[in-house]
């Protein structure tokens, strides 16, 4: 028999076998007219919080107890559980950061996560660290839209399949394409972050042909934006659901925007959600969208019923993990649990404690003190000039002997409370390990730069904090610029500092690290801040309070 006949015969046999299989195999493994219970538990934006905070809130030991109890309860009632994470395990507290989030990924494995989305902060470290973290995790880290620029192939597993009582569930992973500007440019030069909406549509079509799932979920790190109003951010979960065919995704388990996704009505988010409140998830184009705030503060619980191929949500809840509220008792403020205290799992505590002790041994030494709060809260520092933003910029300016300083608010990760300041406080505020850099430019170049950087919108990490400069921003244009109390001269020469991350184009800033006047000092931002605090202690926070140096005017309304 010649080769062509062998191939033809083999193909004919394969086609007949395939047709016979289609005729004899059931289309599904579940039983008709039977109601199945399925619960999806989820967290997101963990950011290194493996240990409880100083008030005894959240932490992975309490989370494990809660999830173990929920699993036992659900399985006792005949249901099944899927545990998912919306990503950003990395970057947040020094005890985790100094150990490459080893306690966090290994802790997630012990809790029993089924899958997670890769978040943008997974790319704050070199790729070899991320690959090491994959080895620590006994669950898949998913992203369908991240490719190797050289090979054109996906860098990570795009989806995972799960079988729950005969129900075939495909879980696809998607990562914000903003990672290209939010990730450290030094580590992602060969990584291509493609449009997750397009990748999702193509992958869903492929899965329907190859895997024939009963349900398709997406675990994403793209952000939830009310009614899809995303500003300068890349498209998020709402845009994803609307882009796909209706009902292509049964559920999106999200992250990135770090909020409880609880709706008051269609396309209207509940603005003042408090722990213990009822939570109604978003629903767009036949897709449920959920997100559980941040740091393991909550475990989201979505209870479904599956019957004859149809999925319906029975209930949804955000369960607080030992969150507390302040009350007044006999004229004094006390913190009490919002709900019953969740006992910390002893085995998990024993596992995590050595990591916590190792980290703390390096961090809890006092380096300075202050007479008030240095403001770095996300919902403040991304909207207005603050004393902490100005202090950090001043520290950079002093180290580089610069005329003024630019500091992206996304690099200010927390506040520093009044009183003693430790190295841990510094690393919590600046965990990324960016270098302080500076550039010498002409006045015209400076003005061109400011017209891009100083006009970045609020509510984004690109919003800039400044020191050593005053200006007015109106209609996306910078005017009345003074540097060192002298008006900007277009033919003058000026030096300013900027984090190396932004100098490389991060946050959409102009890429200036190839400018002939650019210098990377080699000093990490946290080290510079630590040295500045030590040498200027005690810190008078009032000296750094903004007093109208940077004025924004929009629709005749002036903001600082």
UniProtKB/Swiss-Prot annotation:
A divalent metal cation 2 binds at residues 88, 120, 221, 256. Keywords: Cell outer membrane, Hydrolase, Lipoprotein, Magnesium, Membrane, Metal-binding, Nucleotide-binding, Palmitate, Signal. Disulfide bonds: none annotated. Its cofactor is chloride; Mg(2+). It catalyses: a ribonucleoside 5'-phosphate + H2O = a ribonucleoside + phosphate. Degradation of extracellular 5'-nucleotides for nutritional needs. A lipid is attached at residue 22 (S-diacylglycerol cysteine). Residues 1-21 form the signal peptide. It is a lipid-anchor. This is 5'-nucleotidase. One of its GO terms (cellular component) is outer membrane-bounded periplasmic space. Substrate binds at residues 432, 501-507. Its main location: membrane. It is found in: Cell outer membrane. Chloride. It is an enzyme of class 3 (hydrolase). It comes from the Bacteria.
């Amino acid at each position: 028999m010649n080769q062509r006949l062998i191939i033809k015969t083999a193909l004919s046999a394969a086609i007949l076998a395939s047709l016979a299989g289609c005729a004899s195999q059931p289309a599904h493994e579940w039983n008709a007219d039977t109601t199945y219970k399925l619960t999806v538990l989820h967290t997101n934006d963990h950011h290194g919080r493996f240990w409880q905070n100083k008030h005894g809130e959240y932490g992975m030991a309490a989370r494990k107890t809660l999830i173990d109890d929920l699993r036992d309860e659900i399985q006792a009632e005949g249901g099944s559980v899927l545990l998912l994470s919306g990503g950003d395990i990395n970057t947040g507290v020094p005890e985790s950061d100094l150990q490459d989030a080893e306690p966090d990924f290994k802790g997630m494995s012990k809790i029993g996560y089924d899958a997670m989305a890769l978040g943008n902060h997974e790319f704050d470290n070199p790729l070899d660290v991320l690959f090491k973290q994959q080895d620590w995790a006994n669950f898949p880290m998913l992203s369908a839209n991240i490719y190797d620029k050289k090979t054109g192939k996906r860098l990570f597993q795009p989806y995972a399949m799960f079988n729950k009582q005969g129900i075939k569930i495909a879980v696809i992973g998607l990562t914000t394409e903003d990672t290209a500007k939010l990730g450290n440019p030094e580590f992602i030069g060969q990584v291509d972050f493609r449009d997750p909406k397009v990748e999702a549509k193509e992958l869903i079509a492929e899965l329907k042909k190859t895997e024939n799932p009963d349900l398709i979920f997406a675990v994403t790190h793209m952000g939830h934006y009310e009614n899809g109003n995303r500003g300068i951010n890349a498209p998020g979960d709402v845009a994803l659901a609307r882009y796909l065919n209706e009902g292509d995704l049964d559920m999106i388990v999200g992250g990135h925007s770090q909020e409880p996704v609880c709706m008051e009505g269609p396309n209207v988010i509940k603005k003042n959600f408090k722990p213990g409140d009822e939570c109604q998830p978003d629903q767009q184009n036949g897709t449920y969208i959920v997100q559980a705030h941040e740091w393991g503060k909550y475990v989201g619980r979505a209870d479904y019923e599956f019957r004859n191929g149809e999925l319906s949500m029975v209930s949804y809840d955000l369960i607080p993990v030992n969150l507390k509220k302040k009350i007044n008792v006999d004229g004094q403020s006390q913190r009490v649990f919002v709900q019953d205290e969740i006992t910390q799992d002893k085995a998990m505590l024993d596992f995590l404690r050595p990591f916590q002790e190792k980290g703390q041994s390096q961090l809890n030494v006092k380096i300075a003190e202050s007479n008030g709060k240095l403001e770095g809260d996300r919902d403040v520092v991304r909207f207005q000039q603050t004393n902490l933003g100005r202090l950090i910029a001043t520290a950079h300016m002093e180290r580089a002997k610069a005329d003024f300083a630019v500091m992206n608010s996304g690099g200010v990760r927390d506040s520093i409370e009044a009183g003693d300041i430790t190295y841990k406080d510094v690393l919590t505020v600046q965990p990324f390990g960016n270098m302080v850099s500076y550039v010498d430019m002409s006045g015209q170049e400076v003005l061109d730069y400011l017209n891009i950087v100083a006009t970045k919108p609020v509510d984004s990490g690109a919003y800039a904090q400044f020191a050593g400069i005053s200006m007015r921003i109106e209609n996306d244009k910078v005017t009345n610029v003074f540097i060192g109390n002298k008006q900007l001269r277009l033919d003058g020469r000026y030096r300013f500092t900027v984090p190396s991350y932004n100098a490389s184009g991060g946050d959409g800033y102009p890429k200036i690290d190839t400018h002939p006047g650019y210098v990377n000092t080699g000093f990490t931002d946290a080290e510079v801040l630590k040295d500045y605090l030590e040498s200027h202690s005690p810190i008078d926070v009032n000296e750094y309070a903004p007093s109208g140096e940077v004025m924004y005017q929009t629709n005749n309304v002036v903001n600082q």
